[in-house]
A protein has these predicted regions:
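Bacterial N-terminal signal peptides that target proteins for export
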Residues: 1-11
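Bacterial N-terminal signal peptides
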Residues: 9-19
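Sec/Tat signal peptide C-region and signal peptidase I cleavage site
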Residues: 20-27
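A short glycine-rich, His/Asp/Glu-containing loop-to-beta-strand
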Residues: 29-62, 68, 123
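Short acidic-glycine-tyrosine-enriched beta hairpin
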Residues: 39-44, 54-56, 86-103
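Histidine-centered metal-chelating micro-motifs
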Residues: 58-61, 81, 98-111
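Glycine- and acidic-residue-biased ligand/ion/polar-headgroup-sensing regions
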Residues: 68-87, 94-96
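Ligand-binding loop in jelly-roll beta-barrel domains
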Residues: 89, 104-130
């Protein structure tokens, strides 16, 4: 195996890992991979970031993240209504953030506005071997 083959395989694996968080999101929003990198001083952990763009009134399906994944979510623009586990629904405005514990169920994630788009940055810290970071709730 030469270095180019190894590099291609690594790039393919990283692209897959970045794209997987989009699995639970519906057609009305766009999930764009932003960043993925192993955390050098925490062996076995990686940092993955995605940007979720919500059209006016758009919502994600209820979903759960990998059991190892800590999620920090930051509202870049607009307003996002969110409910994690059995907690209350809350509207977060641009500049506000929230946190999801590993294995939590994200019951509601939607654009709170019917007229203005919204954007969310989601940052995952998870086990490097967890390739499926988001799973829809059926």
């Amino acid at each position: 195996m030469n270095i180019q083959t190894i590099a291609r395989a690594a790039c393919t694996a990283m692209a897959f890992a970045i794209a997987v968080p989009a699995a639970a999101h519906g057609a009305a929003e766009t999930v764009t991979p932003n960043f993925q990198h192993a955390i050098p001083n925490i062996p076995g952990k990686s940092l993955t970031a995605v940007v979720v763009d919500y059209a006016p009134g758009a919502a994600s399906s209820a979903h759960r993240h990998a059991g190892s994944a800590f999620i920090y979510a930051y509202v870049v623009s607009g307003e996002i209504e969110s409910q994690v586990d059995d907690g209350p629904k809350r509207v977060y405005h641009a500049g506000e953030s929230f946190f999801e514990e590993p294995g939590a169920v994200h019951r509601t994630s939607r654009n709170a506005s019917e007229t203005t788009p919204a954007k969310l940055l989601a940052v995952f810290v998870a086990d490097t071997n967890d390739k499926v970071l988001t799973t829809p709730i059926k």
